[in-house]
Amino acid sequence: MGQCRNWKWGLESFDFSINRRSSAPGQLESASQMRESWRHKAGRRMFSCPEESDPIQALRKLTELCHLWLRPDLHTKEQILDMLVMEQFMISMPQELQVLVKVNGVQSCKDLEDLLRNNRRPKKWSVVNFLGKEYLMQESDVEMAEIPASVRDDPRGVSSQRASSVNEMRPGEGQASQELQTLPRVPALSRRQEEDFLLPETTVMKSAPKALRPKPTLEKDLNVDREENTGLTSPEPQLPNGPSVVGAKEGKEPKKRASVENVDADTPSACVVEREASTHSGSRGDALNLRCPKRSKPDATSISQEGPQGGATPVGNSESPGKPEINSVYSPGPAGAVSHPNGQEAKELLPFACGVCNKRFTCNSKLAIHMRSHTGERPFQCNFCERCFTQLSDLRVHQRIHTGEKPYTCDICHKRFNRMFSLKCHKRSHTGEKPYKCKDCNQVFTYRKNLNEHKLIHSGEKPYKCPKCLRAFRRPETLKYHQKTHQETTAPRECEG
């Protein structure tokens, strides 16, 4: 019988999916059309085929009922598919989720998915005894916690049989507390009862008697829910002694409640923390800074900055070297638009400075890797050719030359590469992309290396010199070819040019 009641509830709660559809674009169905649509739907649900009946006639009858319900002459294939999927979804879901879907007026699977995704956070539900019947309702925690005494003392026909009527449940999980599981099934509401009772739910809850008031433990539940909603993972810091802390110990709500009560359910957690932090100052503000969600770090970029010469010294927090200050983390901006700060701001965001070239870094590990370029240290050695590298990642890429491993494949010509960067550059031969442009002559190149060599033509620089004849060249390949001329002759000869 429990499954039967749940089945009926699912049918009636999904009645809106047909009645709210328009028979013509821009027109709502009339009351007679709504009743007719529901009659055909109910007839299809209650259809049964006796054993002695003709199965062909039963098939035709069932086809006719489904046609009258789905109306393929008025609805599209997507609408019909949504109707079938949502009906089965409503039949198999718990009652509290059926109420949530019906109150929000969901009419398509896409809207239903958005509703379920946005309602995964903990909600408060209550069982209300009204006119001898019990109803499952969703309520506002803060509004229930602050109902005026003059309003609470007026029962106005609401029964006070349930002393603890507020029970936590998660609609996305479809689980209720033990008290809700022992209650009888919520009766199906007609359309008129739904409009008279479910819609003005705040009015009914404001007039609730003392039996429906939250107990003092509700304050603790509200705090737990708010911490879960904001998604804070860091532990709560120990607050210093102050008026707000003393008021909280005595059972009084601190003033921060005023800044959280008016926050909408869809407000991002970061905005809630920022709004809460803006109402405090002094030591309380410092404590709230520790609760802010972790911001994204800047890219692995270094900024050249004038600084004192010497060893690698972190700038910023002198008490805890190797860790930047929490308050110095900046708000993340749009991807690809990271601005490079200067001066004091650069020291706060990039606290670790190189004492040789004054480049700055976000963490000490990146600085240690950079210092190897000055000291010449190469701690990672290849087991095959004994070649050394400054980073372990470079060693792993190099070892693919010996092992023949090429994990990256071009999806166009199926050519394989041992580095992702090589594959990225190779794809430009298929797409014709030339992202590097010369500022002097507007000539474009496929690779940065070719652009750098081209710039030497405009500057006239020749950085590669022959150690024997001191002749200079722009490209290293040309220098190697030139050096072969010295090896071919036993006696060195004077180079021309």
Curated annotation (Swiss-Prot):
It is found in: Nucleus. Keywords: Metal-binding, Nucleus, Repeat, Transcription, Transcription regulation, Zinc, Zinc-finger. Disulfide bonds: none annotated. PROSITE patterns: SCAN_BOX (PS50804), ZINC_FINGER_C2H2_1 (PS00028), ZINC_FINGER_C2H2_2 (PS50157). Its main location: nucleus. Residues 148-342 are annotated as: Disordered. The keyword Transcription applies. A zinc finger (C2H2-type) spans 352-374, 380-402, 408-430, 436-458, 464-486. Pfam families: SCAN, zf-C2H2, zf-met. GO terms for biological process: regulation of transcription by RNA polymerase II. One of its GO terms (molecular function) is zinc ion binding. Signal peptide: none annotated. GO terms for cellular component: nucleus. InterPro entries: SCAN_dom, SCAN_sf, Zinc_finger, Znf_C2H2_sf, Znf_C2H2_type. SUPFAM superfamilies: beta-beta-alpha zinc fingers, Retrovirus capsid dimerization domain-like. The keyword Transcription applies. This is Putative zinc finger and SCAN domain-containing protein 5D. It comes from Homo sapiens (Human).
